[in-house]
Amino acid sequence: TDRQLTVAALQGNAGAGGVFLSLAADYIYARDSVILNPHYKSMGNLYGSEYWTYLLPRRVSKSHVLSLTRNRLPIDATDARNLGLIDDCFAVSSEEFVNKIRQTAESLAKRPDFFALLQQKAHKRKLDEQLKPLQSYRDEELRQMQLNFYGFDPSYHVARYHFVHKIPHSWTPRYLAKHRRL
């Protein structure tokens, strides 16, 4: 929306959709203990459909988009901040974090340039829409998702079954078990 600024506050770990939901906010903060998994691949090569193809490149470079989504590795809040994925992280308790976010949001609302920030946000969104409408991102993501659901590769359905029925992996996935690559 171009009538308000939004803040995402991550107190706990987030995977795929949770990470990309937070990227829809204007400002993103996390506790320093938070671990993010900004990818869907571990769910049977799922492509994802939360406008991530629009949101992620707004925050990180193209090379980081590729490494984050292809390598399937978790990232801690400090590294996420250093990449620009989130705006900041704080080494505080849950209660202190809530207070810190409240203070940050109140400070943001009281900024003398608040309305200029809203105008900049609206202008950027308008330019983005002219370059490529949000609907195009949605259509492309859903086309890829359709392949996950109805294509030749059954890995999504197997991963979904295991996820729904809480069946753990039989072994550590190879992309995490680097010692097995010898």
Language model segments and positions:
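Well-ordered beta-strand positions
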Residues: D26-Y27, S67, N71-L73, D79, ...
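Glycine-rich beta-to-alpha active-site loop
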Residues: T1-M43
